[in-house]
């Protein structure tokens, strides 16, 4: 029974594809030129990568570290000292 149900659901899922219009219909509002979109994305990504590498190697973006003295004491006192734990 499970095989019949799966086959029926697959048939129902595939029916809209049989009635679909031609995927090459360039006048359709759902037509996308995927090759041009992919090429444009690759070019844009490559330019961003090159710009990032150039910015990192230029040395203009340096981390400015201000050495402020720490507000913590020089030596911290331990929270647990030997002999302070209770034995149950």
UniProtKB/Swiss-Prot annotation:
According to the UniProt entry, the coiled-coil residues are none
Annotated membrane topology is:
Single-pass type I membrane protein
Name a single GO cellular component. Answer: sodium:potassium-exchanging ATPase complex
Q: InterPro entries of this UniProt entry?
A: FXYD4 (IPR047283), FXYD_motif (IPR047297), Ion-transport_regulator_FXYD (IPR000272)
One GO molecular-function entry = sodium channel regulator activity
According to the record, the signal peptide region is: 1-20
- Primary location class: membrane
Task: List residues in topological domain: Cytoplasmic.
Answer: 60-88
Which residues point to the Extracellular side?
21-38
Key words, A-Z: Cell membrane, Ion transport, Membrane, Potassium, Potassium transport, Signal, Sodium, Sodium transport, Sodium/potassium transport, Transmembrane, Transmembrane helix, Transport
Location relative to the cell? Cell membrane; Basolateral cell membrane
Q: Which GO terms describe its biological process?
A: potassium ion transmembrane transport; regulation of monoatomic ion transport; sodium ion transport
Q: Which family does it belong to?
A: Belongs to the FXYD family.
Q: What does this protein do?
A: Associates with and regulates the activity of the sodium/potassium-transporting ATPase (NKA) which catalyzes the hydrolysis of ATP coupled with the exchange of Na(+) and K(+) ions across the plasma membrane. Increases the apparent affinity of the transporter for Na(+) and increases NKA activity.
Oligomeric state and interaction partners are given as: Regulatory subunit of the sodium/potassium-transporting ATPase which is composed of a catalytic alpha subunit, a non-catalytic beta subunit and a regulatory subunit. The regulatory subunit, a member of the FXYD protein family, modulates the enzymatic activity in a tissue- and isoform-specific way by changing affinities of the Na+/K+-ATPase toward Na(+), K(+) or ATP.
Protein name (Swiss-Prot/TrEMBL): FXYD domain-containing ion transport regulator 4
């Amino acid at each position: 029974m499970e095989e019949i149900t799966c086959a029926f659901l697959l048939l129902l899922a595939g029916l809209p594809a049989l009635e679909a219009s031609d995927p090459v219909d360039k006048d359709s509002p759902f037509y996308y030129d995927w090759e041009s979109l992919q090429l444009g994305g690759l070019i844009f990504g490559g330019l961003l990568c090159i710009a990032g590498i150039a910015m990192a190697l230029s040395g203009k973006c340096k981390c400015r570290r201000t050495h402020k003295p720490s507000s913590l004491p020089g030596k911290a006192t331990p929270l647990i000292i030997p002999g302070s734990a209770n034995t149950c």
